[in-house]
Amino acid sequence: METKGYHSRPEGLDMERRWGQVSQPVDRPSLGPAERTEENNYMEIVNVSCVSGAIPNNSTQGSSKEKQELLPCLQQDNTQSGILTSEIKTELEPKELSATVAESMGLYMDSVREADYAFEQHAQQGSLSPAKIYQNVEQLMKFYKENGHRSSTLSNVSRPSRSFLPDPGSAVNGGVMRAMVKSPILCHEKSPSVCSPLNMTSSVCSPAGINSVSSTTVRFGSFPVHSPITQGTPLTCSPTVDNRGSRSHSPAHASNVGSPLSSPLSSMKSPISSPPSHCSVKSPVSSPNNVTLRSCVSSPANINNSRCSVSSPSKANNRSTLSSPAASTVGSICSPNAFSYPASGASVGSSATRDVIPSPDTHEKGAHEVPFPKTEEVENAISNGVTGQLNIVQYIKPEPDGAFSSSCLGGNSKIHSDSPFSSVPIKQESTKHSCSGASFKGNPTVNPFPFMDGSYFSFMDDKDYYSLSGILGPPVPGFEGNCEGTGFPMGIKQEPDYGIYYPEASIPSSAIVGVNSGGQSFHYRIGAQGTISLSRSARDQSFQHLSSFPPVNTLVESWKSHGDLSARKIDGYPVLEYIPENVSSSTLRSVSTGSSRPSKICLVCGDGASGCHYGVVTCGSCKVFFKRAVEGQHNYLCAGRNDCIIDKIRRKNCPACRLQKCLQAGMNLGARKSKKLGKLKGLHEEQPQQPPPPQSPEEGTTYIAPAKEPSVNTALVPQLSSISRALTPSPVMVLENIEPEIVYAGYDSSKPDTAENLLSTLNRLAGKQMIQVVKWAKVLPGFKNLPLEDQITLIQYSRMCLSSFALSWRSYKHTNSQFFYFAPDLVFNEEKMHQSAMYELCQGMHQISLQFVRLQFTFEEYTFMEVLLLLSTIPKDGLKSQAAFEEMRANYIKELRKMVTKCPNNSGQSWQGFYQLTKFLDSMHDLVSDLLEFCFYTFRELQALKVEFPAMLVEIISDQLPKVESGNAKPLYFHRK
């Protein structure tokens, strides 16, 4: 894999200038013809083959066979295009090597003296003398002399993934080291790390196969040194040499601080470089097969380490990172194809490496990104100078696209939850095994919503429950958490379960109250006026279980009996009143609802209603408006389309639409008088009466009931008998009380106002009104004395006359004859008159309505004229009981005349007023003839016109049609034409 270095030490710039002045001849191995150009400055991809063993410190005198086994075999893979070298000459002449190392060490010591100020505070145990360094150099030279003339080749042989721990005896001279290897990571220019060609976990391998990774904290003596990547030091250090700040080694045991040693063919000025090395700018010494890095030096067969990693052929010691073939206590030894992740090496010491995280901004063009887990904390404990069993408590969250099937922290590592170094996990995955060979044993997840006995109590026999779940809703799906002691998860706010607060044995099952899914509510009101509201479901017919409620005072006393009950619990539960057992449901419901919201609203504007005014529940504002609009005879006009919105805010914008809505709601001035009459009638009905004596037609229908024994009310009203005579209903009062009710047309405003729809609506309304007329006629005084056939004939002939007369009266009373008030939900304006295909007939009816305005008809006059219209049309042949009909009609004419003469407004003009009324009745016949003609036409063409007729209307028209067309109907006029 491509790797690049990152030069982070400022002293590297100065060392570059110094080493640029040094010139040393270096032998270059032969390259291929195509590989000898200086333009081959590109990164080489190398696979590392590491030996799992480690060379002890005193193994330099071993046999050549053993040393050959410990050296890596680097073989060239001709199949990969990224490898340039074929055969590499790894040895240098002893004289040249010693001279080069001598000069290098001289310059190195100068740089160390300059950098001493940065480490004086920490250098208590780890300082080394130059003599010791040269001693190590001499050992390195001996090692190379014995292992000379051995060529190493690069190899990319794939092997099974595995990680190696160094031998416990690899701790030499009691050196204490801590290391952690963390890989694989990508190598980038800004924050390079080390990766093998096949995404190996080991970052660097020296010729002896010992790998190390930078970006960890290493304790040298008493101080840690941190690498530029993650505030942690590079990884390994030779056990015998603890050199400060050395970052690179030449191929022949040279140690240097941040000095880039480059080959003569490199673009750098540094003098020492292996022949095929094409170093980038500021890159350190590169071996013949080195993959160039900016701040990395490798041995002749080295694969580049991370920023501060050095791989040396001999045991040249380095504080930053060093992988030596002789002896090393590097944390992990990994084979070239050991792709297990992460390779964690044994460390010597007790301090912990912290926050080993790769740089986040590493992404090189063309490089395959490998996710790297975040390690929170690693604790490595090795006792008695020997690498022991890893005791790592680490939580790793691999990325979703990670290509790693397992995270390996060591073959024998096991996680112990009771470890003194246990760390609190920031994020814990639900996987059973986070690491191969290591299982995390945490607290088992507990259901956050346990069903606790004593917390959910049954309410009644129907098994309705008052529970927290009913109030707060169902649990959060998929919620997981731990519930220990009195702690609860974040899903819901839950009070601790105090045994003293909810004693299971002492409190009855109906003590806990709330709101359940069935709609039942049981509320405690704060204060002395505590009440309980209970709304039962529809299936409960009675409150037979209400007596099962214990007295609330008993419940409160049971709570108060516990002295250790906290005050904050008692604050929300004051003393409540006792609820009687025989309380009714209506009382409970009325008390609980209260008067927070008005129970009635105005049917006109939607404001709060103040009462029933003019027959409709309205507010005071609409009451006054309607009275002034009707009595003042104002001709309001709408500026829009007579469809303005009338509500509490906009009710004053359009008086025309407001008046129309008042009329649609059913308001009329006559309802006020009817209300007063109803009160008087109710008072009169309290007195027991005998049936009236039989009367002859000459005696009339007016009578006074004789007073009988006083009722209970006589104690309050001693003179009730005399008052009852005065309050005996007159014919006028009787007619006002039996007046037909106003019916609704059932008009559907969502349908278009076509002629068919409007006529069908009017026919349905006429059928409803006909039913009311029949009911009215049955209770009409004297009408029941007529034979049934005469009653039916009179109703059939007078049907159209009665409906048109009632329409004119409603229009006069509700709209002052401005609109046609067919029904509260069907009011015709000029536009709808045209749409109904009966505009001319509407104009004729409008003239009748205007006569009401001109003559100022009263409701009493209207009631008598209505009866006379019922008796105004008979067959030519007469009725079966013609005498009874004539007598009845004459009596009502007399009563109308008496009423007109007694009216104070008509004093002196009583006969003139009576004449106008009778002339008006005669004019109704001319209008009715035109209406009947139109009605019969639509009835014949109902299939073609698609006009609907109700069943009752069909029956009446079918019987009336042949009689009228044959001329059998005879209208009765008051005045001759």
Curated annotation (Swiss-Prot):
Domain annotation NR LBD: ranges: 719-957
Which stretches of sequence are listed as region Hinge? 668-718
The UniProt entry, under Gene3D superfamilies, shows: Erythroid Transcription Factor GATA-1, subunit A (3.30.50.10), Retinoid X Receptor (1.10.565.10)
Named from the GO MF annotations, one term is: zinc ion binding
Q: Which UniProt keywords apply?
A: Cytoplasm, DNA-binding, Lipid-binding, Metal-binding, Nucleus, Phosphoprotein, Receptor, Steroid-binding, Transcription, Transcription regulation, Zinc, Zinc-finger
Disordered: annotated span = 1-37, 231-288, 305-327, 344-368, 682-703
The record places its NR C4-type zinc fingers at 602-622, 638-662
Region spans: Important for coactivator binding? 775-778
Q: Where does Zn(2+) 2 bind?
A: 638, 644, 654, 657
Q: Where is the composition biased (Basic and acidic residues)?
A: 1-19
Which residues does the annotation say bind progesterone?
763, 769, 810, 938
* Residues binding Zn(2+) 1, per UniProt: 602, 605, 619, 622
Which residues mediate DNA binding here?
602-667
Low complexity bias located where? 259-288
Composition-biased stretches, type Polar residues, lie in 231-243
One Gene Ontology term, aspect cellular component:
cytoplasm
Q: Subcellular location, in the record's words?
A: Cytoplasm; Nucleus
Family according to the record: Belongs to the nuclear hormone receptor family. NR3 subfamily.
The record's function comment reads: Receptor for both mineralocorticoids (MC) such as aldosterone and glucocorticoids (GC) such as corticosterone or cortisol. Binds to mineralocorticoid response elements (MRE) and transactivates target genes. The effect of MC is to increase ion and water transport and thus raise extracellular fluid volume and blood pressure and lower potassium levels.
Domain remarks in the Swiss-Prot or TrEMBL record: Composed of three domains: a modulating N-terminal domain, a DNA-binding domain and a C-terminal ligand-binding domain.
Listed name of the protein: Mineralocorticoid receptor
- Please name the source species: Tupaia belangeri
Lineage of origin: Eukaryota, Metazoa, Chordata, Craniata, Vertebrata
